[in-house]
Amino acid sequence: MNKLINRLESKWGSFEKDQHYFKQWDTSNGQRKSYLNVLFDPVDLSSLYLAKEYFKCEFHPSLLKFYEQYNGIMLFSESLRIYGIESNDAGLYDPYCIIAQNIDDNIQAYGEQFANFVVFGYYSSCLFCFDKTNFDFLYVVDTEQEKVVYSFKSLAELLAHYVDYLIDEYDVCGKKLHYDKSLEGLPIANVSLEFI
């Protein structure tokens, strides 16, 4: 994680302590702050033990190491998330509880091959998962294709894969350089595209 954090800080500056928020900027109307990247403070490890009990398994070793340092991460204006062990009262910048998200994501609905998968994050239409019965890899499941599209030995490898792409998609002010043109013409998109 240190290598990833150093890479982000080299482009946007240091993380500032709050819930560990990173490089805030005003939207054009100046009425709200936005955060490009957020690292959430770790929670008591007893919460991790409760999550293990809920899923009836250990967690992938690289996830355990991550959760000892952080209670989730939000990167690139929520484009990529690693869920937290528990939620908090932070409102918009909530780490998303891994247990609640697994109920919502329902990875098992995509086929029997995912029966032992636990979802721990996402990017776009892809869910990040580990297999409760085999810790060799962390998996990326494309929910549109309903299949595993990538596998990584560690969380650091998985995050590096996505950060390599996403870091160049945002300028030094945190503005997305290439927004989804399919949103053009939608009333809400016309208002918000200037902030993407």
Question: Each predicted region: which residue ranges?
Answer:
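A C-terminal-region feature
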Residues: 1-49, 69-196
